[in-house]
Curated annotation (Swiss-Prot):
Keywords from the named record: Cytoplasm, Hydrolase, Nucleotide metabolism
Function summary: Nucleoside triphosphate pyrophosphatase that hydrolyzes dTTP and UTP. May have a dual role in cell division arrest and in preventing the incorporation of modified nucleotides into cellular nucleic acids.
InterPro entries reported for this sequence: ITPase-like_fam (IPR029001), Maf-like (IPR003697)
Coiled coil: none
Name of the protein this chain belongs to: dTTP/UTP pyrophosphatase
Lineage, top ranks: Bacteria, Pseudomonadati, Pseudomonadota, Gammaproteobacteria, Lysobacterales
C-alpha cells in the first residue's frame, strides 16, 4: 500500500490524479532549518523525515508499505520562506517577493522497508508582479496565505500576481506529478 505522509489537502488532491490507491497519514514532523543548512538540503531532509516517520507508523501492520514524503519551500537567495505564522508575517513575505523572481523547491521522497529511498528535487522559478501594499494586505486578509509556503497559493487568488512560471506548476502546488509518477514507477508502486 502507498501512504502519503502529509496533511496537505493539495498533495492529497494531486496524488489522486496519478490514479494510484493510497492512504493519507496525519503526522506532525518538525520543519526547522538547521543553521547553515542549504535550502536544497533542508527541503530534502524534511521530505525524508516525513516519509520515514510515516513508515515507522505503518510498517508493523504493512510490511510492504511505501511512504511518500514531500516538502515545498519558497526560496529567495538563501532565505527560506516557510508558512506564515500570522497575517503580518504573510504581508512581510509577500512584500519581499513582490516584483521579484523566486524559486520554489519541492522534494519528493519514497521509502519502503529494506529499500533505499528514492528522491527527486524539483526547482521552479516564479516571478511576481510588483504589488502595492493595498493588494498585499487584501490578499493576506483573505486567509489564503495561511498554511502555504511563501504565503501564497499558485492555484488560488495569488495566480493573478504571477507574471511568469518556469518549471512545474504541480510542484509549486506541492507535489510535482511528473517526477512523482517516475519515482512511483521506479519503486514498483505505479
Amino acid at each position: 500500500m502507498l501512504y502519503l505522509a502529509s496533511r496537505s489537502p493539495r498533495r492529497h488532491e494531486l496524488l489522486q490524479r496519478l490514479d494510484v490507491p493510497f492512504q493519507t497519514l496525519e503526522l506532525d514532523v518538525p520543519e526547522v532549518r538547521a543553521p547553515g543548512e542549504s535550502p536544497e538540503h533542508y527541503v530534502h531532509r524534511v521530505a525524508l523525515d516525513k516519509a520515514r516517520a510515516g513508515l515507522a507508523l505503518v510498517q508493523a501492520d504493512d510490511a510492504q508499505a511505501i511512504v511518500l514524503g514531500s516538502d515545498t519551500e519558497v526560496v529567495l537567495g538563501e532565505r527560506v520562506f516557510g508558512k506564515p505564522v500570522d497575517v503580518d508575517d504573510a504581508i512581510a513575505m509577500l512584500t519581499v517577493l513582490a516584483g521579484r523572481t523566486h524559486q520554489v523547491l519541492t522534494a519528493v521522497v519514497l521509502v519502503g522497508a529494506q529499500r533505499p529511498p528514492l528522491q527527486a528535487l524539483v526547482v521552479s522559478e516564479v516571478t511576481f508582479d510588483a504589488l502595492d501594499a493595498t493588494r498585499i494586505a487584501a490578499y493576506a486578509a483573505s486567509g489564503e496565505p495561511m498554511g502555504k509556503a511563501g504565503a501564497y497559493a499558485i492555484q488560488g487568488r495569488a495566480e493573478r500576481f504571477i507574471t511568469h512560471l518556469s518549471g512545474s506548476y504541480s510542484g509549486v502546488m506541492g507535489l510535482p506529478l511528473f517526477q512523482t509518477s517516475q519515482l512511483l514507477t521506479a519503486f514498483g508502486a505505479h
